[in-house]
């Protein structure tokens, strides 16, 4: 269900049974899988690939350009697996030309205020506690619980 107060670019591919709450912005070249819920005031920028049955809470920003001075607007992505929960005010930056993508695997919980920088690879079944951050180019295996400030 697309709320009339949300903006969804005509070039975005939204599957069935996706709920998009008011004041959310979804840019061009975005794919969102079936059964995903997107809360209010979420921004999903170009290059986002979001799997099935995900929950993205208010204030999250997905697929913003990387915070890397070498970035020259290359076409890169953020790939989020199935059954991922992204809590309030999480930021996930898309990749650079190095890896070309930032990846979050299936069944992950990314708690409030986390930051996952460009070119990171997060495995399946991971939990990031509140305020955890990854600098660019980090790799996190499966079943990792990450905490830190």
Language-model segments: residues:
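Structural signal for interior beta-strand "rungs" in well-ordered beta-sheet cores
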Residues: 2-148
């Amino acid at each position: 269900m697309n709320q009339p107060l949300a903006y969804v670019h005509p070039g975005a591919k939204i599957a069935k049974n996706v709920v998009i709450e008011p004041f959310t912005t979804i840019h061009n070249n975005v794919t969102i899988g079936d059964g995903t819920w997107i809360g209010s005031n979420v921004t999903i920028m170009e290059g986002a690939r979001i799997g099935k049955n995900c929950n993205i809470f208010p204030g999250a920003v997905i697929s913003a350009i990387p915070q890397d001075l070498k970035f020259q607007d290359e076409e890169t992505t953020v790939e989020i697996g199935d059954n991922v929960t992204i809590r309030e005010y999480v930021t996930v930056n898309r990749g650079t030309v190095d890896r070309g993508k930032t990846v979050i695997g299936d069944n992950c919980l990314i708690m409030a205020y986390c930051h996952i920088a460009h070119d990171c690879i997060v495995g399946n079944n991971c939990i990031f506690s509140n305020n955890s951050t990854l600098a660019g180019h980090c790799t996190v295996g499966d079943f990792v619980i990450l905490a830190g400030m």
